[in-house]
Amino acid sequence: MEVVAAAILKNNINDYDSFCLTHANANNMKVNAADPLNWGVAAEAMKGSHLDEVKRMVEEYRKPVVRLGGETLTISQVAAIAAHDGATVELSESARAGVKASSDWVMESMNKGTDSYGVTTGFGATSHRRTKQGGALQKELIRFLNAGIFGNGTESNHTLPHTATRAAMLVRINTLLQGYSGIRFEILEAITKLLNNNITPCLPLRGTITASGDLVPLSYIAGLLTGRSNSKAHGPSGEMLNAKEAFQLAGINAEFFELQPKEGLALVNGTAVGSGLASIVLFEANILAVLSEVLSAIFAEVMQGKPEFTDHLTHKLKHHPGQIEAAAIMEHILHGSAYVKDAKKLHEMDPLQKPKQDRYALRTSPQWLGPLIEVIRFSTKSIEREINSVNDNPLIDVSRNKALHGGNFQGTPIGVSMDNTRLALASIGKLLFAQFSELVNDFYNNGLPSNLSASRNPSLDYGFKGSEIAMASYCSELQYLANPVTTHVQSAEQHNQDVNSLGLISSRKTKEAIEILQLMSSTFLIALCQAIDLRHLEENLKNSVKNTVSQVAKKTLTIGVSGELHPSRFCEKDLLKVVDREHVFSYIDDPCSATYPLAQKLRQVLVDHALVNGESEKNSNTSIFQKIATFEEELKTLLPKEVESARTAYENGNSTIANKINGCRSYPLYKFVREELGTSLLTGERVISPGEECDKLFTAMCQGKIIDPLLKCLGEWNGAPLPIC
């Protein structure tokens, strides 16, 4: 019996697969019989490194043409069209037949008197109503859905950003091209012309719950296409246009469209606004995720961190791919870094100068970022599936001669993906804030000045103190935004739409989170560049101090009063050890001050040598104690001048020692910030404020200018961690 049952089951499955393949072929769908639930496709999409995927996104973003066929649209293509950065849209001619077939089916069905939702019936909870005036019904649909508020003439702006509207238009075209919606191809061509001529309908910012799709905002696109008097659009230069002017400027030669049965529903009953904005958000989120990995590596460099936190074995044993990749990227940046080499010498020389292990914000950054990158990557794939989905209702199945009433308009993938992405962004922001807080705190930053102040007089330079307060503000708001949107669903439309995704609301909040994380990333990178320059200044100042102490020691401690060699000559080596070990910025504003550690410890070296000088101390010719005053007086005469000379040379670009960053893999980002954006070391002596420099970088980041230098930092990475050896 079991064998017979198995055979019957196998035959039934084969019959089912055969039916699916036949039906798929009839509708130009791609279905894999071996993967009917699509898990295999989803898993396949996650193969390869995240960085390679980001590189592909950037490459796609920069292509001049986006060809729509309904199944291959990517978030980077949506972001490119949304930005209107020169890319144009082309429709696949091969889709025309399928689109026409579904449109014809609707008309034939209506002519036969077939009862169909939204064609001969009312909508939602009032779908029990009936009408034979299909065109009038679509017109009324658009009228009652024009329920948005724009707040024209008020200080607040309640219009959806142009980029989000353009993204929605592109995604909606892509959905309708698949031929399941019952709309004319000519309408899709008209929307394409609006996009290519940079004519953007005005959509309300609020008013959708993204189930049944984004009804209210999408109705304003339909309103423009049908020439409603309240429809407005922005032209290429931002000028306000009515529907007639928009058509003329876009080169749409047809009259306003008289919607046929189902066409109004096809235009509005979809998730395009939420998923379109989500696509823009995720393009930025993926870039920011890679940036956070590189910033963490630069943080390790300037903090004199121990690079073993990136060792592949540690992360291999944890198994999480996001963590393994984050560690490998940081390892690549740190491998061969001059900062890491110097830090190693420092740790060997005096292992007690800092904690044995770096603090969590540095040491566990791969473990922290890894899961967040996985979340962002999974959300990206989820939204890419959504923008290539058919997400309206009912669906026209021409091959089976029926309309399917379902709920693909439910935008749960958008709401959930955006909530998850926002949580990931908030966690990235928390890490950057923790790293920033260590960087500006002289108790934790291994010798950098408090607040990263770079002036000669620290009492009149508070560096990044204001920026730290701003970072706390940014981080707090970002943490607040991490709260989920999808837990705040309200039953709508006479309890017909009793569960709904809130997809667009979640996308909007995630866009806010992106902007705040860009503010944080900009501020942090400016601070890191300040720290890089301070390490350069520190090295030159220390070199000057060391040379001067050596010179003074040779002059005052080598020879006695009668020309004989003096026992104090053996102090020089220990004096130079003091210079090596003492943090430069703890004394450099007044290097010979008796209240500062350098002068105190130099004196202590001489005292210690005197104490072991024994009987020789009783002889004025061999006494080390009697040399202390001579040494200190000579040092006071010479050292301040040499320090000032070294600082002046640094400021004039004539440093004795070159900046270590020049030979590091993180250099492209530093070069971008300093040379391309024209920023420089901030000091209290200069008028320019931290906010001005951060603003330059934030603007450049929003314009995508940081992408190339960021990827250049990782240009030599082969996609694998260093071998365990």
Swiss-Prot record:
Belongs to the PAL/histidase family. It holds the Pfam family Lyase_aromatic. CDD domains: PAL-HAL. It catalyses: L-phenylalanine = (E)-cinnamate + NH4(+). The keyword Heme does not apply. GO terms for molecular function: phenylalanine ammonia-lyase activity. The active site is at Y117 (proton donor/acceptor). This is Phenylalanine ammonia-lyase. Its EC number is 4.3.1.24. InterPro entries: Aromatic_Lyase, Fumarase/histidase_N, L-Aspartase-like, Phe/His_NH3-lyase_AS, Phe_NH3-lyase, Phe_NH3-lyase_shielding_dom_sf. Contains an active site 4-methylidene-imidazol-5-one (MIO), which is formed autocatalytically by cyclization and dehydration of residues Ala-Ser-Gly. Homotetramer.
